[in-house]
């Protein structure tokens, strides 16, 4: 079954190189571009360009260019009217050969903010007006796993997503069990509430208005190499009931799902066609709520369905995440 992204969330999975495509809705303040991939074992260099047009001699508003050449560094620049500008160089290398990475470009009013694996790396001041940027160009010694444009093409009834972290309301209780909430789309999925960038774990987010049909939750994160397990709960705060509990267990290679209703656990479900939660891996989860089930997608592929066991699933008002995981983005 096909993955359908929510408005304002434009992912491409396993794109081929060179990647040279339009930016959905154009570039503007408040957008973030997430690039997940793996650096080649024999990596010498790769680049990410924010370009004005798609022609061979297109201007480049921002050129991001890691180079392994004996003097490991990252070169940052722009190109206007066929000429490169003044280079900015960072004599540090945040990428490792053969290692997975997450590279985030946050579009701010005055600059691009670059974050690598959750750590701020550099701020590059705008030299070309943002509204002129139309295409993203990626190529070099890497393998791309996903490119996500977040905050692009917002629906008319939503404000653009801010590019800064917003603290999420904390619940008074923490339910010590795993669970993830996914939503089924029957028409157009919706997302509500401000996004959280690099939120701390444990994460407690309140679902304003409760869990409704066609609501979509996005969770992006990283599994540390020594991780054993983590938990995502979709919970009713007033009762402690958990409509969907997702528990990736790296030590078992399992993705356990369950519910906790009226003080008792239900029967576990474990069957999946593949497991995206490997140590040292990034993941991108999309949870959709349907009228009769949750649908869970990972990295753009259907992972599992979970039929509603809590008939009044609309009472779910909390999303809890805890355990051995690093979060880079949560949209609830």
Curated annotation (Swiss-Prot):
A GO MF term: carbohydrate binding
The entry's keywords: Lectin, Phosphoprotein, Repeat
Disulphide linkage map: none
Binding site for a beta-D-galactoside: 265-271
Alphabetical list of InterPro entries matching this protein: ConA-like_dom_sf (IPR013320), Galectin-like (IPR044156), Galectin_CRD (IPR001079)
One Pfam family recorded for the sequence: Gal-bind_lectin
Mitochondrion listed as a keyword: no
PROSITE patterns for the chain: GALECTIN (PS51304)
Phosphoserine, modified sites: 267
Residue ranges annotated for the Galectin domain, each copy included: 19-150, 203-332
Domain notes: Contains two homologous but distinct carbohydrate-binding domains.
Function of the protein: Galectin that binds lactose and a related range of sugars. May be involved in the assembly of adherens junctions.
Subunit structure of this chain's protein: Monomer.
Protein name as catalogued: Galectin-4
